[in-house]
Curated annotation (Swiss-Prot):
GO terms for molecular function: toxin activity. Pfam families: Toxin_cobra-type (PF21947). It is found in: Secreted; Target cell membrane. This is Cytotoxin I-like P-15.
Amino acid sequence: MKTLLLTLAAATIVCLDLGYTLKCNKLIPIASKTCPAGMNLCYKMFMMSDLTIPVKRGCIDVCPKNSLLVKYVCCNTDRCN
């Protein structure tokens, strides 16, 4: 019985996410990745010439400022990009 309880406890610890980790979409939205520590935002980058198709997605620590050529959209929830 003790072995069963220890096994269940170990499985629970392994399955739990003990620290919050953000998941962001990669370039293809069906694929996501877990962001490393310190990267607490997801982003999409668009070329200003075509705001309908993102050219890059991923994790980032600070949302960059938009420029004349590039627009960034940042968010902070799982797979929000």
